[in-house]
A protein has these predicted regions:
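C-terminal motif of bacterial Sec signal peptides marking the signal peptidase cleavage site
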Residues: 15-18
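Secreted/extracellular ectodomain signature
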Residues: 21-225
Length: 225
């Protein structure tokens, strides 16, 4: 027999009990308590995220807003000079723990770091902390397209020099950032030439405005524990 785990919450004077067939406790928002990955719902007009610390703080705050704040969350971002790493490069793949990672609907994103960096983007898997798909090139998607997620990374999760918005501190129109496609789709659903990559599809236009080419300054957030 499949186990059902339930949690009672008080909302508008009523006790609401939520259950999960997967064995996870489900909060009033429907977020699985074991979730360890999401795309940020919060956006940024520029590539200045306040550095790695500012981006990590964003992930932590968003996680807390849906009851996942007990975990330690990190932004999937690469940098060329990390002050916490002797001003040496830090790769996004080395910031996020060892896995496995599931999204807030309980769907497995990847079991290991290696698995994560061989999979493709998917609108139904790469969702935000509230369980919503990111507007992109998937059929029926609302506009504007916002599937360009900031990473500064190659497909293997290592830093791309010159494509990190000066380590996520710059809003310069002369700098740019590497982005991935959360839905794994290019214009018209094209998946050729790396457009299906969740973390390294192409460079954005510049760090002064994340919107052109299909972005909104979103980031990927992973729980390390």
């Amino acid at each position: 027999m499949k186990a059902h785990i339930c949690v009672a919450t008080l909302a508008a004077g009523l006790t609401v009990t939520s259950c999960s067939d997967t064995g996870e406790i489900v909060g009033p928002t429907g977020v699985q308590s074991g979730a360890r990955f999401f795309v940020s719902s919060a956006t940024s007009v520029t590539g200045n995220l306040g550095g790695l610390q500012g981006a990590d703080n964003r992930c932590q705050s968003l996680a807390a807003s849906v009851g996942l704040g007990a975990k330690t969350w990190r932004a999937y971002l690469s940098v060329e000079r990390d002050s916490d790493n002797g001003n040496r490069p830090t790769n996004a793949r080395d910031r996020i723990g060892l896995g496995p990672w599931t999204n807030v609907n309980g769907v497995v994103v990847a079991n290991t770091v290696a698995d994560l960096h061989t999979r493709k983007g998917n609108a139904d898997v790469f969702i935000d902390e509230q369980g919503r798909r990111i507007p992109g090139q998937w059929p029926g998607s609302p506009g504007p397209v916002e599937h360009d997620i900031l990473t500064g990374s190659n497909a293997d999760g290592t830093v791309i020099p010159g494509l990190t918005c000066d380590d996520w501190t710059s809003a310069s129109a002369t700098l740019a950032a590497q982005v991935g496609h959360s839905d794994g789709l290019g214009p018209g659903g094209n998946t050729a030439n790396g457009l299906d990559s969740w973390n390294s599809a192409h460079a954005n236009q510049n760090c002064a405005n994340t919107a052109p080419r299909g972005g909104a300054g979103r980031i990927y957030c992973f729980a390390v524990n």
